[in-house]
């Protein structure tokens, strides 16, 4: 046992068992703090790990600094696999640099960025590649002016488009109102020309287009005039038949009397 070493401690179980009326109770103890020596060892380990992380980060930065982004105009025959084989890079790197999700997104761009190694053969031998700062001036000028115009007055353009849409809607409403007025005027002219036909069309169809006074007259005819006419007709008919019968009886009586007188005068 060396000087400065902590004295050995007896073994202590992590659980104390106590008896109770219901059964046994298990008491768990909290873990005691480790001695200062362990904390010093951890500090030494941390101090040893720090320079390693710095070295790895510096290496990563050096690796990133070795790459250079160059641009190339896109043609219809290009694709990501062809560009990756031609310039010795990965398809995933080209997608990551240009923010491409699919291969078809490449054809929406005029030029594509290709990651190549700095001071390599491709940067010196191939003339198609150029840095993003070396774009032609005639392409940069209109793009800058367009961006300035778009970013300068976006709201004004939206307002003008909105006002144009409102004007178009107003013109459509005016045309629709004119058409409706023409239809109403034509229908009014037709109603004036046809007279009673237009009035008949205004009925709902359940009363056959008959007015209330027409219905009253029809009821008077059916309920009063026709029964009176019926009674008068049959009474006159009965009186005529009785008169004819009386005349026939009188004629027959007179004929019988005349025959009797004639028979009495004869020898």
From Swiss-Prot:
Basic and acidic residues compositional bias: what residue ranges? 49-64
Where's the LysM domain?
A: 70-114
Per the record, membrane topology reads: Single-pass membrane protein
| Protein transport is among the record's keywords | no
Residue numbers on the Extracellular membrane side: 1-211
Q: Which residue stretches are annotated as topological domain Cytoplasmic?
A: 233-267
Q: Does the keyword Glycoprotein apply?
A: yes
Q: What is this protein called?
A: LysM and putative peptidoglycan-binding domain-containing protein 4
Native organism taxonomy: Eukaryota, Metazoa, Chordata, Craniata, Vertebrata
Q: Which gene encodes it?
A: lysmd4
């Amino acid at each position: 046992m060396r000087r400065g070493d902590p004295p050995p401690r007896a073994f202590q179980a992590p659980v104390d068992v106590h008896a109770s009326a219901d059964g046994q109770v298990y008491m768990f103890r909290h873990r005691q703090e480790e001695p200062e020596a362990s904390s010093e060892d951890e500090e030494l380990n941390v101090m040893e790990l720090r320079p390693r992380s710095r070295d790895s980060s510096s290496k990563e930065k050096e690796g990133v600094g070795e790459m250079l982004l160059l641009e190339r105009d896109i043609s219809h025959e290009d694709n990501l696999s062809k560009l990756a084989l031609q310039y010795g890079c990965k398809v995933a790197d080209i997608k990551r640099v240009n923010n491409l999700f699919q291969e078809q997104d490449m054809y929406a761009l005029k030029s594509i960025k290709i990651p190549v190694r700095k001071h390599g053969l491709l940067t010196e031998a191939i003339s198609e590649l150029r840095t993003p700062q070396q774009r032609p001036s005639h392409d940069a000028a209109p793009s800058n002016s367009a961006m300035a115009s778009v970013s300068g007055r976006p709201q004004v353009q939206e307002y003008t488009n909105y006002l144009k849409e409102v004007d178009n809607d107003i013109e459509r409403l005016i045309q629709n109102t004119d058409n409706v007025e023409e239809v109403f005027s034509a229908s009014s002219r037709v109603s004036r020309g046809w007279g009673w036909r237009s009035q008949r069309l205004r009925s709902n169809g359940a009363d056959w287009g008959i007015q209330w006074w027409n219905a009253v007259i029809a009821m008077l005819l059916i309920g009063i005039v026709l029964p009176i006419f019926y009674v008068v007709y049959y009474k006159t008919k009965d009186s005529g038949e009785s008169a004819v019968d009386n005349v026939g009886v009188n004629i027959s009586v007179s004929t019988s009397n005349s025959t009797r007188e004639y028979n009495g005068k004869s020898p």
